[in-house]
Amino acid sequence: MSKSLIHPSDLRAGLADIEMADETVDLVYKNLSEGQAHLQGEPFDIKDLPEGVSKLQISDNVRSDTSPNEYSDEDDEEGEDEYEEVYDPVSAFQDFLDETGSYLISKLKKGEKIKKTWSEVSRVIYSYVMSNFPPRPPKPTTKDIAVQADLKKPNEIQKISEHKSKSEPSPREPVVEMHKHATLENPEDDEGALESEIAHQVAESYSKKYKFPSKSSGIFLWNFEQLKMNLDDIVQVARGVPGISQIVERGGKLPLRCMLGYVGLETSKRFRSLVNQDKLCKLMQEDLNAYSVSSNN
């Protein structure tokens, strides 16, 4: 029997994982639909509005110094805004799932096991969902609202203490302690967000080929798939590229060709045998400079 055949137990396990993934996609779609109910013309609860909306006032006063030309320009701008394409996160997520499914099928056709491939794909889907659809905080219950209302009722003792606190400077030691506590917790969240964003952008271009200078004074094509590494390992090595964390913090696109060259030099003997390292270092520096400038803008 050929070693390339897939065991039936692996197929059953893979089908079960795919069914679970479908249920997860349906759940995410349902949550998105409920979250966008107000865009579909469905009524929504007034409690969901931000605080301070009730304080807004609509003024009927029109500036007398406004010329008719200004009104026409404003109308034209409003008309152009109406024809602008609205970003739909559901369709973007569906496109991402289609690309991920194509990648999964291509890996299975090459003879890779479903367990290994699905674990990698599931991490990519999880990072995409966490980066694009962060969980919403739970709504306060009526009991919490009642407790907050009771706490806000001032009595005479509180009024006296507030009056004294206004006349005397308040100590800032608790604020410093809270700030220190927050700075101790932020690094773990930042590390997770950094790895998720790198994994997301690498997964989107996993099979895309990039041009690299070869030792024979020409070029050759290479992609992340040819590294034959897990996505987690690629992310860990790519984090060593200088300036990557700053680009992610500014929400810019990552220099994927530079990252691919860096990971290839660190892990792939075949890549090192093909590439002209002097030209590659210059190319990587140019990519870093260009993407750093674009992320600042």
From Swiss-Prot:
UniProt source species: West Caucasian bat virus (WCBV)
Locus of motif Nuclear localization signal: 208-211
Comp. bias (Polar residues): 57-69
This protein's GO CC annotations: host cell cytoplasm; virion component
Chain positions covered by the region annotation Disordered: 57-83, 153-176
Role played: Non catalytic polymerase cofactor and regulatory protein that plays a role in viral transcription and replication. Stabilizes the RNA polymerase L to the N-RNA template and binds the soluble protein N, preventing it from encapsidating non-genomic RNA. Also inhibits host IFN-alpha and IFN-beta signaling by binding and retaining phosphorylated STAT1 in the cytoplasm or by inhibiting the DNA binding of STAT1 in the nucleus.
Gene Ontology BP term (one): symbiont-mediated suppression of host type I interferon-mediated signaling pathway
Residue numbers bearing the Phosphoserine modification: 64, 207, 268
Domain of life: Viruses
Name the UniProt record assigns to this protein: Phosphoprotein
Family: Belongs to the lyssavirus protein P family.
Ranges annotated as biased composition (Acidic residues): 71-83
InterPro entries: PP_M1-like, PP_M1_C, RABV_P-like_C
Gene Ontology molecular function terms on file: RNA-directed RNA polymerase activity
Keyword Calcium listed: no
Keyword Transmembrane recorded: no
Pfam families: PP_M1
Keywords of the record: Chaperone, Host cytoplasm, Host-virus interaction, Inhibition of host innate immune response by virus, Inhibition of host interferon signaling pathway by virus, Inhibition of host STAT1 by virus, Inhibition of host STAT2 by virus, Interferon antiviral system evasion, Phosphoprotein, Viral immunoevasion, Viral RNA replication, Virion
Post-translational changes noted in the entry: Phosphorylated by host PKC and by an unknown kinase.
Motif Nuclear export signal per UniProt: ranges: 49-58
Subunit structure, interactors included: Homotrimer when phosphorylated. This trimer is stabilized by binding to the L protein. Binds soluble protein N, and ribonucleocapsid. Interacts with host STAT1, STAT2 and PML.
